Amino acid sequence: MKYLQGQHILILGLGSSGLAMTRWCAQMGAELTVADTRESPANLQVLKSELPEVQFKSGPFVANLIEGTSVRAVFTSPGLSPIETLPVIEAAKAMGLWVGGELSLFVQALENLKATRDY
């Protein structure tokens, strides 16, 4: 079972962790948007090549990345400053969205295995 199937996910940061989370969420059937403060992060070409359906946004991490959208979860790369991501994280929490990172994706994957396959 793909527990993220059809869910719109926002990934903050396109470093190694952000790319890994994006790949995982795509495998799970999520609709994805990736945001990075850099206009052309090093992994942007990899993202476009491997996952051309993923939307990329550059610029500051602001609340309108999620407000008025269908985003249901926000995952943050661990290398990002919490101060930098705060506007998006606060808005996501206020909207009741799932907020996390690589570890929370891993934990949820294990919970899904336990629920669906008695793992």
Model-derived features: where do they sit?
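N-terminal leader/targeting and accessory segments in enzymes
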Residues: M1-Q108
